[in-house]
């Protein structure tokens, strides 16, 4: 063997050793190492790392969220009917500090022992104590939450650091004849719910109309009450105005009557003071003086009457007095 061949062999072995020693850990993973089949306590984070070639191996363990799918899980109900869950998804993640302990106890494929097998066991436990009606319809909406809580409770004691984030369970497959019956039953149930909701809507609309009618009636009653109150106030105002006008009219009439009475009283008092014997005598003389016919002679008293035979002077004097009184009345 030539020196060049030996050098090439050494370089090839060295290159293979370097290639075997250098490895990469992806982000979101933790590297665990085995030497001679024994798990080493050392772990590594993301990046490039070196290890002893040929005698040391590594495995990358994911610590971010991952979804484990458990497929075609058989489940026997309490009534003896066999059903199958097509797919159950378990969303979980591993705390990086717990990687070494979980890998040591359950290997790097820990999800098979802690998740897959546990899901099979818990589902069969659930189905065995419930009827098909409960599993398929009645309690189906609770299966995922109950399964999550049960898994997490067991993992907390068995493998602390493995966290169950969510569990999703698909509708189980049941025998075709039973499925058709359930579909018919669900259809009738849906129709019943629709009818019930329709009835509630009708009742709600009727109640709304009734409330609207009550509100409208109350509104009309309030408006009528307000108008009635306005009319009453108007009538009371008119009554007060009429009373005031009547009082004013009575006051005016009373004042007028009092004034007329006072005027008549004062005139009577004035006439009483005025009509003295002397004043009457004076007025008689004025009346005589105002007469345009004046007679001279001894027969003056006869100027007020016909000068017939047998007339006396006393009659003439009375006629003069009457004439004087008539003149006073004219004044």
Swiss-Prot record:
Where, per UniProt, does this protein localize?
A: Endoplasmic reticulum membrane
Q: Which UniProt keywords apply?
A: Cholesterol metabolism, Endoplasmic reticulum, Glycoprotein, Lipid metabolism, Membrane, Signal-anchor, Steroid metabolism, Sterol metabolism, Transmembrane, Transmembrane helix
Provide the membrane-side ranges marked Lumenal in the record.
24-331
Cellular-component GO terms for this entry: endoplasmic reticulum membrane
Q: Give the matching SMART domains.
A: PHB
**Among the record's GO biological process terms, what is one?**
SREBP signaling pathway
> What positions does the record give for glycosylation?
105
- Residue ranges that the UniProt entry lists as topological domain Cytoplasmic: 1-3
> What InterPro entries has UniProt attached to this entry?
Band_7, Erlin1/2
What transmembrane ranges does the database entry give?
Answer: 4-23
GO MF, any single term: cholesterol binding
Where does it primarily localize? endoplasmic reticulum
Identify its membrane topology class: Single-pass type II membrane protein
The UniProt family comment states:
Belongs to the band 7/mec-2 family.
Q: What does this protein do?
A: Mediates the endoplasmic reticulum-associated degradation (ERAD) of inositol 1,4,5-trisphosphate receptors (IP3Rs). Promotes sterol-accelerated ERAD of HMGCR. Involved in regulation of cellular cholesterol homeostasis by regulation the SREBP signaling pathway.
The identity of this protein, by name, is Erlin-2
Q: What is the lineage of its organism?
A: Eukaryota, Metazoa, Chordata, Craniata, Vertebrata
Q: Its encoding gene is what?
A: erlin2
């Amino acid at each position: 063997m030539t020196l060049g061949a030996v050098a090439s062999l050494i370089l090839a072995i060295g290159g293979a050793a370097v290639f075997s020693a250098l490895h990469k850990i992806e982000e979101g993973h933790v590297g665990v190492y085995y030497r001679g089949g024994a798990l080493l306590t050392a772990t590594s984070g993301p990046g490039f790392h070196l290890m002893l070639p040929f005698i040391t191996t590594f495995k990358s363990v994911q610590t971010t969220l991952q979804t484990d799918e458990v497929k075609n899980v058989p489940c026997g109900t309490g009534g003896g009917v066999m059903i199958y869950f097509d797919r159950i998804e378990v969303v979980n993640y591993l705390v990086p500090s717990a990687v070494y302990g979980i890998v040591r106890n359950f290997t790097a494929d820990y999800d098979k022992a802690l998740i897959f097998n546990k899901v099979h066991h818990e589902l069969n436990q659930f189905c065995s104590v419930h009827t098909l009606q409960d599993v398929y319809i009645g309690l189906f909406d609770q299966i995922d939450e109950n399964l999550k809580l049960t898994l997490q409770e067991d993992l907390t004691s068995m493998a602390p650091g493995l966290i169950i984030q969510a569990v999703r369970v698909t509708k189980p497959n049941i025998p075709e004849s039973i499925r058709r019956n359930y579909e018919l039953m669900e259809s009738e149930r849906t129709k019943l719910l629709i009818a019930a909701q329709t009835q509630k809507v009708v009742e709600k609309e009727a109640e709304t109309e009734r409330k609207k009618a009550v509100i409208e009636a109350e509104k009309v009653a309030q408006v009528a009450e307000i108008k009635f109150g306005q009319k009453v106030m108007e009538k009371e105002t008119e009554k007060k105005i009429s009373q005031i006008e009547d009082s004013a009219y009575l006051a005016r009439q009373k004042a007028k009557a009092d004034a007329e009475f006072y005027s008549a009283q004062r005139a009577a008092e004035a006439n009483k003071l005025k009509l003295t014997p002397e004043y009457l005598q004076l007025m008689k003389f004025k009346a005589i003086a105002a007469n345009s016919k004046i007679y001279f002679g001894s027969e003056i008293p006869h100027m007020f009457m016909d000068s017939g035979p047998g007339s006396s002077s006393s009659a003439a004097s009375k006629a003069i007095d009457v004439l004087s009184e008539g003149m006073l009345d004219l004044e």
